[in-house]
């Protein structure tokens, strides 16, 4: 097996593992939030080790300051203001802003 194919295979495996960790974080969120936060930390570590980006949906499911898994209505507040979505982590108070992109589906 060549180095290039090994690299592709490990990145694919890492992506699958990250997806599994985020599903586990969702399950653990109601049971023990510390476990779900740990799953997020492990997923980030895998992504950094493999030098790959997480998907947009995965990146928006946790706080980038305290790495807490977001449970809407419990530890996160979401507001829409002037074309931006403002996500506030209620654990650390950090605000993250995402631009709202309007699609042309009129």
From Swiss-Prot:
Highest taxon of source: Archaea
Subunit-structure text: Consists of a catalytic RNA component and at least 4-5 protein subunits.
Q: Which gene encodes it?
A: rnp4
Give a yes or no for keyword Nuclease in this entry: yes
Read off the Pfam families from this record: Rpr2
**In UniProt terms, what function does this protein have?**
Part of ribonuclease P, a protein complex that generates mature tRNA molecules by cleaving their 5'-ends.
UniProt remark on cofactor binding: Binds 1 zinc ion per subunit.
GO molecular function terms here? ribonuclease P activity; zinc ion binding
- Which GO BP terms, alphabetically? tRNA 5'-leader removal
Q: Which Gene3D superfamilies match?
A: 6.20.50.20, Immunoglobulin FC, subunit C (1.20.5.420)
Q: Which cofactor does it need?
A: Zn(2+)
Q: Which family does it belong to?
A: Belongs to the eukaryotic/archaeal RNase P protein component 4 family.
Question: Could you tell me what reaction this enzyme catalyses?
Answer: Endonucleolytic cleavage of RNA, removing 5'-extranucleotides from tRNA precursor
Which InterPro entries does this UniProt record tie to the protein?
Answer: RNP4, Rpr2/Snm1/Rpp21
Q: Which organism is it from?
A: Methanosphaerula palustris (strain ATCC BAA-1556 / DSM 19958 / E1-9c)
**Which keywords belong to this entry?**
Cytoplasm, Endonuclease, Hydrolase, Metal-binding, Nuclease, tRNA processing, Zinc
Its Enzyme Commission number(s) read: 3.1.26.5
Amino acids binding Zn(2+): 63, 66, 89, 92
Intracellular or extracellular location(s): Cytoplasm
Quote the cellular component terms of the Gene Ontology held in the record: cytoplasm; ribonuclease P complex
The protein here is known as: Ribonuclease P protein component 4
What HAMAP family does its record include?
Answer: RNase_P_4
């Amino acid at each position: 097996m060549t180095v290039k194919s090994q690299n592709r295979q490990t990145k694919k495996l890492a992506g699958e593992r990250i997806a599994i960790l985020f599903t586990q974080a969702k399950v653990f969120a109601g049971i023990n939030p510390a476990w779900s936060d740990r799953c997020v930390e492990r997923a980030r570590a895998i992504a950094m080790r493999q030098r790959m980006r997480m998907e947009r949906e995965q990146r928006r499911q946790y706080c980038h300051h305290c790495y807490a898994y977001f449970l809407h209505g419990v530890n996160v507040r979401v507001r829409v203001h002037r074309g931006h979505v403002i996500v506030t982590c209620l654990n650390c108070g950090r605000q993250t802003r995402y631009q709202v992109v309007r699609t042309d589906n009129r």
